[in-house]
């Protein structure tokens, strides 16, 4: 669940994005201060909008915001009060982590993409399709996992590139908006001593 808030641009609306809706036709069901956004074809909820959000709790900052469990509980109380059966889940796992490329094979339908198996934790490996020219087996880099919001506002969801499933993105310094990031293509390269699954820390993982 990706939570965003920008009172100046959007108004006092807390926006909670659950899934990528793609090109699907969307519909809205509103009850009180809660609006459910769902796909018409599957009746699947893809987002919630909470109006007059500051009446539930104080919200600091703008752009992506991170809710406490207590705040999510308060929103769930409102969903229940308005008659919605679904409940919000507060996913507090880090979405930008150290990843290590364990395997890499050429994409069968591309001359520049590779299909990578990337360790993102002690017991977790994900498949990521990438076109970085410096990608190689053994490289440690920063991975944006599904549920991440990039500095430019784009959201990371499970997807596919030319028919091959991809569950995240290996990031370049420029995509992470790091200071003095080189303009050339290529994902960030970390020290071999870094451990897969470690949360991304710009102060530690980036040296200008």
Please place each PLM-identified region on the residue numbering.
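Phosphate-backbone binding interfaces of nucleic-acid-interacting proteins
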Residues: 1-208
